[in-house]
Amino acid sequence: MEIVHIAAECYPVAKAGGLGDVVGALPKYQTELGHVAKVVMPMYRTKFLYDNEWELVHEGGQHIGPQFFHYSIIKEKTNKLGFDLYLVDINGLLDREKIYGYDDDTERFLSFQVAVCDWINKWSHKPDVLHCHDHHTALIPFFVKYALEFKDNMADIPTVFTVHNAQYQGWIGWDKYYLLPSFDSWKWGMLDWEKTINPMASAVKCAWKVTTVSHSYLDELKEAANGLEHLFGYEQGKSHGILNGIDTQVWDPLTDNLIAKNYDKELVEKGKRKNKKELAGKFGLDPDKPLISFIGRLVGEKSADLLPEAISQSIYQHNGHANFLVLGSGDPQLEDQLDQMKHKFNGYFNSYIGYSEPLSHLMYAGSDFLLMPSRVEPCGLNQMYALRYGTVPMVRNIGGLRDTVTDMGDTDGFGIRFDQASIGAITYSIGRAIDL
């Protein structure tokens, strides 16, 4: 089976979150199972781009509204990732250093989707599946069905749409509908949701199959989906919750070259002690105290706003018998709070504002506990990384966290779970961790 994954991220090419991890791993394992898996993504100015060799495989031109753009498709030559990787280069739109956060992101990802459809439409054969990931590629199921230029040749190609996070839907005002390729006008309702063009809603309507990244998240979307609750309920017949996995070759404490000492389950105690000592030394913490870490975006979705008070209370309540370490970036005000806490709780708390892939590996290997108090967690990969490295996950009982972590109080439990995204629930769980 030939499967074409279309996404905005793919690790290690360009990654902003869990989407990149999944798109970087899933095609590799599909290929190992005998399928032909490919990834198509935008060409950003990243280290991976400059460090590898590429060949030009296609050039073309298209329009978004009245604006013509030229695009080219380049392919990584050596199959370095274990699957065919293609980058779409659109000069002035996609070739930027960051993935997201530009004022013209609508035009950027719209042009990317149009270019992908235009390219695949010119293939001498049809792929077996187009697998679209999140709202950045969510208009493709509509385009292949109803865009006048594509539908005759592409409408019968099966499409799968995976919801990695329904909070971000890619809304486009109807005042910009002219940017879209010409389509059957009587199908405008397949784009619309609450009087706006909603790419995610369109994909849920138009894709042959819809998947979410955990079983529990699919159920939760019928109750809380940022306005799409009724749609997910209506389309439940073609929707499936499939739990994400992790790349066990990248995340392997026995071979990981980003940690201080490698180990397996027989040497886990010795290995973690060495990594904890290394980590504590970097951040001025005590390697003999329990280390509770948080790795993630500093946003409300992750309950990061609760961290300063929960950590402060826990340090006072337990007389400094635990250390805390935070890795992440996001809300500037929250970043400032955490920075101030480093001085207030010197020797008990520290943080690294930003993202560091090497540091995240060392934190999984050197921490005793990983805290994930998320308000929303479609799947969550961090708790799986933690378990892989022998670190106990402390998670809210929601989404993929519910599907992957059982509480120590249950039979065969191996984590700490709590029900509420609240300071009280977090501090109580921290107390349970310290008492172990």
PLM-predicted stretches and their roles:
Residues 1-436:
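Catalytic cores of nucleotide-sugar-dependent glycosyltransferases that transfer UDP/GDP/TDP-activated
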